[in-house]
Amino acid sequence: MNKPESNLNSVNPPNLRSTIVAASAMPWQPTQFEGIEMKILYSDDEGRSTILFKMAPGSVVPLHEHTALEQTFILEGSLEDAEGSCGAGDFVWRPGGNIHVAHAPRGATFLAIFNRPNRFFDGTKFFTSAE
């Protein structure tokens, strides 16, 4: 965040100041799913997280349940499931209880915001869960 004026000072104490994440400088990390990489931009002990994902063409996120609201903004490519397809510039949100399989036939890059970790039916842990 650039300061519009050089004499501006934060009025917030250190624990309430903005945290700037240089996402473009972060390396992509592998996930437990083939062809899917991520950058965890935010996560907390209550299960909230913001994750940038990159899915290779043909990659799949297997059957899972959203245990709380999940919001996704598609930056590149497209994501598909049984309920439809969303492409670059589209926003999709899913309520808690939504169950689906997501796939990216042509690849996709997207930002996802989770209020709680997903539950994978094959027992796989969520992206931010410790192994």
Residue ranges and their predicted role:
Residues E34-H66, S85, P95-I99:
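Conserved short histidine dyad/triad with adjacent acidic residue
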Residues V60, D90-F91, T109:
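Residue-level marker of beta-strand positions
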Residues M1-G47, T128-E131:
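A short, N-terminal "cap"/entry segment at the start of jelly-roll beta-barrel domains
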Residues R48, E70, G107:
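Conserved catalytic motifs of the protein kinase core domain
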Residues A56-P57, H66-D81, A88:
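Glycine- and acidic-residue-biased ligand/ion/polar-headgroup-sensing regions
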Residues G96-F121:
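Ligand-binding loop in jelly-roll beta-barrel domains
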